[in-house]
From Swiss-Prot:
Lineage of producing organism: Bacteria, Pseudomonadati, Pseudomonadota, Gammaproteobacteria, Moraxellales
UniProt keyword terms in alphabetical order: ATP-binding, Cytoplasm, Disulfide bond, Nucleotide-binding, RNA-binding, Transferase, tRNA processing, tRNA-binding
GO molecular function: ATP binding; tRNA binding; tRNA-uridine 2-sulfurtransferase activity
Residue numbers marked as site, Interaction with tRNA: 149, 378
GO biological process, one term: tRNA wobble position uridine thiolation
Enzyme Commission number(s) from the entry: 2.8.1.13
Name listed for the protein in its UniProt record: tRNA-specific 2-thiouridylase MnmA
Source organism per UniProt: Psychrobacter sp. (strain PRwf-1)
Length: 398
């Protein structure tokens, strides 16, 4: 990984790109990732209204069985086709299930086996939606791809080495901003992507869908991990990883129950632990404080802000900087002063980032205030103003 030169915060003052800023839309072909949801549907409408040559692509990323997931996928494809028919554009389909299994799902299982809590959506965006999809769209003659993500991007700029890139920016709707999930996508890929709904708030997106009588106008937003569907997470994971039950132990060493397997729990979790009333303990909620892999014990304690859940430092690795260049400031004695999120929708947290490797692919982060339930396997994502700098996988905390 290369390090940047002359880094300063002014480098992130480029304006957001609007559809009207793209020259010659009538000669510009855009392939939209059509998920069968309202956001991608409206993205296609907005691109069409702006005068682009628009086509759709439905991605099949998981080989479903004949159960609920299969029915949901078929419904999504039917809805995507109905929207494309309604607005008069072609819909292509592509099967990326093999790529998804190799690049995303196997990593997902390995992380759970190692006792961490991964976020497969981040890897899916990096490896599938902005790699496999982008590559496929290019074979269709696309100048850009587009998605229904609530995020924005800057105008393109050229790095010193000649690579054309763009900044990833927060979506205008703070409640829906998805830049956290896109932080691992390189700026060269962002430069080839349009985010039509990034400038809108969700109610406006639904209003546009209703105005155009789209079948997806009132469709419920999808939640959770795409390949799990409506199944219980525990039931799904048991199909692929053997459960290893063990003891539930209090923070002062008392065994008070049995857990079903450490992979089913995450730090800070309150519900679903299976602890009833405990003798000589107050009637207060119990929280997961630690997963002791060496002894296969789930450590629990009482108190939402238990000291074991609070930390002010973390180490992150596998850093993906959007610019594909680590900011020079992380190599300085002062470090990089910025904001961070250690989970989706967390309010910005002020911190300082220091390089922990020669190439900036590993960092130490010191927060101004203690953080609750920092979770290994999740991502720490960094921001300056509206711009998402990138992020990495949380390895440890203290």
């Amino acid at each position: 990984m290369t390090t940047s030169t002359g880094f300063d915060n002014n480098a992130y003052n480029l304006p957001a790109l609007r559809l009207s800023d793209v020259p010659n839309p009538a000669q510009t072909r855009v392939v939209v990732g059509m998920s069968g949801g309202v956001d991608s549907s409206v993205s296609a409408v907005l691109l069409q209204q702006a005068g682009f040559q628009v086509e759709g692509l439905f991605m099949k990323n998981w080989e479903e069985d004949d159960g609920t997931e299969y029915c949901t996928a078929m419904e999504d494809l039917a809805d995507a086709q109905a929207v494309c028919d309604k607005i008069g554009i072609n819909l292509h389909t592509a099967n990326f299930a093999m790529e998804y299994w190799d690049r995303v799902f196997e990593h997902f299982l390995a992380e759970y086996q190692a006792g961490r809590t991964p976020n497969p959506d981040i890897l899916c965006n990096k490896e599938i939606k902005f790699k496999a999809f982008l590559d496929y769209a290019v074979t269709l003659g696309a100048d850009y791809i587009a998605t229904g993500h609530y995020t924005r991007r800057s105008v393109n700029y050229t790095r010193e080495d000649g690579l054309e890139v763009a900044h990833l920016m927060r979506g205008l709707d703070n409640n829906k901003d998805q830049s956290y999930f896109l932080h691992a996508v390189g700026g060269d890929k962002i430069a080839k992507t349009l985010f039509p709904v990034g400038e809108l708030e969700k109610p406006e997106v639904r209003r546009i869908a209703e105005e155009h009588d789209l079948i997806t106008a009132k469709k419920k937003d999808s939640t959770g991990i795409c390949f799990i569907g409506e199944r219980r997470f525990k039931d799904f994971l048991q199909q692929y990883l053997p459960a290893k039950p063990g003891n539930i132990v209090t923070d002062d060493g008392i065994t008070i129950g049995k857990h079903d397997g450490l992979m089913y729990y995450t730090l800070g979790q309150r519900g679903g632990i299976g602890i009833g009333g405990v003798k000589d303990r107050p009637e207060e909620p119990w929280f997961v404080l630690q997963k002791d892999l060496s002894n296969n014990e789930l450590i629990v304690g009482q108190g939402h802000d238990h000291p074991m859940l609070l930390s002010q430092r973390l180490t992150a690795y596998k850093l993906d900087w959007v610019e594909r260049i680590a900011p020079a400031a992380i190599f300085s004695e002062q470090g990089l002063k910025c904001m961070a999120k250690t989970r989706y929708r967390q309010p910005d947290q002020s911190c300082t980032v220091f390089a922990d490797s020669d190439d900036g692919s590993r960092v130490k982060v010191i927060f101004d205030e203690p953080q609750r339930a920092v979770t290994p396997g999740q991502s720490a994502v960094f921001y300056i103003g509206e711009v998402c700098l990138g992020g990495g996988v949380i390895e440890s905390f203290e």
